[in-house]
């Protein structure tokens, strides 16, 4: 069953889930967990049309973006700035010591833990998210606000294992962006800062992919920090959607970024739909509401109460109202940067200073002079009439066809196949299954409430049968004790549902699905446990009463005497407390719901790095070479001549013989676009150089000196600022030749090399529909080889995919900084920015 996240259908984020509110799993996408279960194919055409229109409008507000939607993938240490020079993101690979992320992951996995019951009830693999640290809980039904999260409260001892990761992350933030770190550190109230850091809250996500969103509630004058703690996966890069760039992240990597920019995750790069993968990530941030007056007053109230009770373990004597700044929760303004391979390379931290200034100069020149871009790379940054973009119908959707929210009247749908599904899953509410998820106390409450209602139903049924022995249908008395017992049982069931969904807001389809199983469970109990006839109670009657509970229960409560209203409220609180005390990851039970103690910072302990023989956070941050001012400074202007070497594949004596090309829709897409036709008709671009000479040819363009040479030729021992290897590896064979080619030419670059190649993988490779992907794979190599042969006059062509090219780059002793994708390129060209690995 495909499931898609509810959040794409809502305009406002659920603060309790930020920043993972609009997440989904690539193999388990959700707008509604039980879309087929609740609606199925029986929905009428008019309703389907309205639903699809509503869904499309929602997706416009919160779209999912794929890797192909972005021009740049950053891999190395990167500082990406907007057109006004403001830092948008800082990527630091291998930033955190692995022992620190491992220790933290062991604890924080419990914060997102779900049991197998939830998957059994609602299908698929549960996407997990949780919060730790401190939270304001505004806009939630939690009565007591501005305090520890339930996870932190219940895992005080284990929580200490997270502190090294907190310290390392804070030190990196301080070293890279000291001004913002200081502003955030000055604003966060001391009572809710995590281990002396400028963070108040962690959001932990497991197996999550987010749609485009901004993080609501973060401190406006700070940055959020994303770290990947553990995982085995490819893809899922963090993308800044308005800038067209992605940050590739793996375990121990850290990304500092402006969370008020729209961002999302690209697709999981796994071709098999059932591929095994996992990813645990953590977002560190300051929840600005915790510094606003309502929360400060709550801290003061608790402190005053603790003093009146003569508490001896107070960590504070007074609460200071700090300057919290202005937090508008509005998206940050966007100042786009035109993207070229040079601007892409200029973002590499390793190329800062003189190299970045040169790259910025080259970027400006190719922006002003499109012919210079073609002279250097063989094609423009973007080709309007080249390889066409994929149509939506060619791509596996994030969701299957879904039927979006309609007016909810409580209860559940009574369509035949849906009722059958509910009956098939009714046993998940049996006691032995509930014990897998909930503690004994809560299961006992469920059992007692269920037994009490069944006893009253049995008593009422027997009375009705005595009055009329031929009766076959149960008559429900709305004023009876049985009715009130049913409402009480519904209160217990509602807490069961909340627990199964991890206290997140449940969308209406999920809620209807649950109540359908609940009704099927009770109807079966009436038949098999108290001897009622098949259909005497019936799903329809229970559905009517569930609608009454959802929309009429509050009205009945208001009509009750005050003492009964208070008893019902206490009863509901008792049920919720029992459910929350369910053991998760062997947590220590605690009365979190009613906790009013002034227990801020009671979990804090010092970390002795010297005793543990761990690198200190400050020394760890120094590894990345950030200056005292951080990464804010823009590069100066380049002066003097910039030298560039272009290396071309040597043409053979004749073009590749014309071969019979396949005929198919995919072959036509590659070969018959106007840009491809121009390549086939034009003279090969490397014919102008003399094939009889092995020496380079020099072209001057202002203060740019461009040398051109064939692969195998000589440059007379010169070094160059930058080298552009233009489609060389496609002219090599085997494993050894491409490595030797890379080693030779990258060694001549003072700063970096651009490895420009055809990528045999379709840009949407991992999300192409299977029939489209198979057709593409069958023709792509022969078609692109024909285009390459026409462009470079080569007999033998060995085209490769990005993963294969990345392997060559790594084995050749080079480091990958980034990848640039030429939009619409008829050769599906990509440029890898690489530099020699430091010894």
From Swiss-Prot:
One of its GO terms (cellular component) is nucleus. GO terms for molecular function: DNA binding; metal ion binding; thymine dioxygenase activity. It is an enzyme of class 1 (oxidoreductase). Disruption phenotype: Does not affect growth, gene expression or the stability of some repetitive DNA sequences. The genome contains only about 5% of the wild-type level of J in their DNA. Cells lacking both JBP1 and JBP2 show a complete absence of base J. The record marks 548 as: Involved in J base recognition, conferring specificity towards J-DNA. Residues 415-583 are annotated as: DNA-binding JBP1 domain. Keywords: Dioxygenase, DNA-binding, Iron, Metal-binding, Nucleus, Oxidoreductase. Binds 1 Fe(2+) ion per subunit. Its EC number is 1.14.11.6. InterPro entries: 2OGFeDO_JBP1/TET_oxygenase_dom, DB_JBP1, DB_JBP1_sf. 2-oxoglutarate binds at residue 279. It is found in: Nucleus. Its cofactor is Fe(2+). Dioxygenase that catalyzes the first step of DNA base J (beta-d-glucosyl-HOMedU) biosynthesis by converting thymine to 5-hydroxymethyluracil (HOMedU). DNA base J is a hypermodified thymidine residue found in the genome of kinetoplastid parasites, which is localized primarily to repetitive DNA, namely the telomeres, and is implicated in the regulation of antigenic variation. Also specifically binds to base J-containing DNA (J-DNA). Monomer. Binds to DNA as a monomer. The DNA-binding JBP1 domain (DB-JBP1) is necessary and sufficient for binding to J-DNA. This is Thymine dioxygenase JBP1. It comes from Trypanosoma brucei brucei. The gene is JBP1.
